[in-house]
Swiss-Prot record:
Belongs to the WD repeat CDC20/Fizzy family. GO terms for cellular component: anaphase-promoting complex; cytoplasm; nucleus. Keywords: Cell cycle, Cell division, Cytoplasm, Mitosis, Nucleus, Phosphoprotein, Repeat, WD repeat. It comes from Saccharomyces cerevisiae (strain ATCC 204508 / S288c). This is APC/C activator protein CDH1. Residues 29-44 have a biased composition (Low complexity). Gene3D superfamilies: YVTN repeat-like/Quinoprotein amine dehydrogenase (2.130.10.10).
């Protein structure tokens, strides 16, 4: 008895024994070719009558719903700025103005016709839309009262009978709606004859004129009186918007600075009043004359330079070293004229007040030196418990601010030993400090990585005026001479510069380009350019401010005549 190993080949059982006898009685009838074809042919679906559909039915509004205006005005807006995460305030304001213009234009095109019917006095529909305030979401659809004289009705699609239209029958002929506005381009490509159905669709006139320029198309489609844009919308688009300040986000000059130290406590660049930039690169100091572009090698040392600072007149340069010595160079002679001792560790900060040079060191001490005296220093201050990493003189008010690695800021009156004020709110080292050239007694301080906060103090009233989270380590700062704005340089983890509006404390611009901490910062004598230096061994020149406008001098003849009056 043979068995089949393939279960799928003979899986169907044989005839049932109960039906076996009946199957023998079934007689075979002859099958015609037509019937066999019908049996073997594939089943087909029953044909259905074809339906011809017309063009889309465009709904229209029966009544203007003022709630729709409110709903549009309550759409999601640009999120509020956070100074720690925003890119810059100017770009935000530009984007906000574009959003507001678009929203106003959209609402005026949708609802302007109805609004213009109920204008009071000289108020236009644009003014009414701008003065519309969004309602709360839960009350927009619940109110049934009238607002501004309009009945609050929902926007609805009218039935065909109300719109004066007939319903489309399944056998109606499709009709393309006629355009409401024609353009010059339509006249050029219009068919040559009023042909009836069945005529050639490709029978067109030849183009009579040359191809229209983009300006001509814009003139014909938008500025033309036949334009579908409402006149007040045109006026809105053509009206000049708010002019924003243009700030260059790219440095206009980049210089290689090999061996520029990447040390948070160093201060290695400074700009003189004679427009000469001094840079300490490793064990050498170079001078760059920005008027001529000449670069001069000033000096070398066996130690490492850690700080430098120009005297107010720009004739002498003070240089601090890692061994604690301070040298003073005559720039014209390119010669060291004096070496001052007193510190036993590196000198990380220097600041001048006329003929008084103040130095701060890692030995926790501040020394006042009168360069006219033979003694290397005449006063010692030991207010800080750790390294002194920031010093700034306010020459106009004769006040000194010092910041230390102990997170403390001290303010001194002149060369006194004891501070008159102490600020201890920072949570990291305070190196970055700047006095306001516009308001007396206003001091800005910035904290390190663990703090990241920019604080502005009024030392005359002992009041903290501002406290902003900058988002990253503040390494240095300069206050603009020409505007009430502040530039801060940052380290971990943004490596950028931030321009702040000191009135609102909003970031105006973020300047990117450095790939390491921006530790060194200085301002040009005319107050227009900021130079930044970083551990990526580059110096970048940023044009941020305009020159101050010259003051109009009174008529000399009238002034002289006035002075002659006794």
């Amino acid at each position: 008895m043979s068995t089949n190993l393939n279960p799928f080949m003979n899986n169907t059982p044989s005839s049932s024994p109960l039906k076996g006898s009946e199957s023998k009685r079934v007689s075979k009838r002859p099958i015609s070719s037509s019937s066999s074809a019908s049996l073997l042919s594939s089943p087909s679906r029953r044909s259905r009558p074809s339906t011809v559909y017309g063009d889309r039915y465009i709904p229209s509004r029966t009544d203007i719903d003022f709630n729709s205006i409110v709903s549009i005005s309550s759409m999601a807006s640009v999120p509020a700025l956070n100074p720690s995460s925003t890119e810059d305030q100017v770009e935000y304001q530009k984007e906000r103005q574009a959003h507001e213009t678009y929203n106003t234009l959209l609402k005026n095109e949708l609802f302007g016709e109805m609004l213009s019917k109920d204008t009071v006095g000289s108020e236009s529909s644009i003014d009414r839309i701008k003065n519309t305030r969004p309602s709360t979401r839960g009350n927009v659809h619940a109110e049934n009262t009238t607002r501004h004289g309009y009945e609050l009705e929902r926007v609805s699609t009218p039935p065909p009978e109300a719109a004066g239209l007939e319903e489309f029958s399944p056998h109606s002929t499709p009709v393309t709606p006629r355009r409401l506005f024609t353009s010059q381009q339509d006249e050029i490509t219009r068919p040559s004859s009023n042909s009836v159905r069945g005529a050639s669709l490709l029978t067109y006139q030849q183009r009579k004129g040359r191809r229209l320029s983009a300006a001509s198309l814009l003139q014909s489609q938008f500025f033309d009186s036949m334009s579908p844009v409402r006149p007040d919308s045109k006026q809105l688009l053509l009206s000049p918007g708010k002019q924003f300040r243009q700030i260059a986000k790219v440095p206009y000059r980049v210089l290689d600075a090999p061996s520029l130290a990447d040390d948070f406590y160093y201060s290695l660049i400074d700009w003189s009043s004679t427009d000469v930039l001094a840079v300490a690169l490793g064990k050498s100091i170079f001078l760059t004359d920005n008027n001529t572009g000449d670069v001069v090698h000033l000096c070398d040392t066996e130690n490492e330079y850690t700080s430098l600072s120009w005297i107010g007149a720009g004739s002498h340069l003070a240089v601090g070293q890692a061994n604690g010595l301070v040298e003073i160079y005559d720039v014209m002679k390119r010669k060291c004229i004096r070496t001052l001792s007193g510190h036993i560790d590196r000198v990380a900060c220097l600041s001048w007040n006329n003929h008084v040079l103040t130095s701060g060191s890692r030995d926790h001490r501040i020394l006042h030196r009168d360069v006219r005296m033979p003694d290397p220093f005449f006063e010692t201050i030991e207010s800080h418990t750790q390294e002194v990493c920031g010093l700034k003189w306010n020459v106009a008010d004769n006040k000194l601010a010092s910041g230390g690695n102990d997170n403390v800021v001290h303010v001194y009156e002149g060369t006194s030993k004891s501070p008159i004020l102490t600020f201890d709110e920072h949570k990291a080292a305070v190196k970055a400090m700047a006095w306001s050239p516009h308001k007396r007694g206003v001091l800005a301080t910035g904290g390190g990585t663990a703090d990241r906060r920019l604080k502005i103090w009024n030392v005359n009233t002992s009041i903290k005026m501002s406290d902003i989270d900058s988002g990253s380590q503040i390494c240095n700062m300069v206050w603009s001479k020409n505007t009430n704005e502040l530039v801060t340089s940052h380290g971990y983890s943004k490596y950028n510069l931030t321009l702040w509006d000191c009135n609102s404390m909003d970031p105006i611009a973020i300047l990117k380009g450095h790939s390491f901490r921006v530790l060194h910062l200085t301002l040009s004598n005319d107050g227009t350019t900021v130079v930044s230096g970083a551990g990526d061994e580059t110096l970048r020149y940023w044009k941020l401010f305009d020159k101050p406008k010259a003051k109009v001098q009174p008529n000399s003849l009238i002034f002289d005549a006035f002075n002659q009056i006794r």
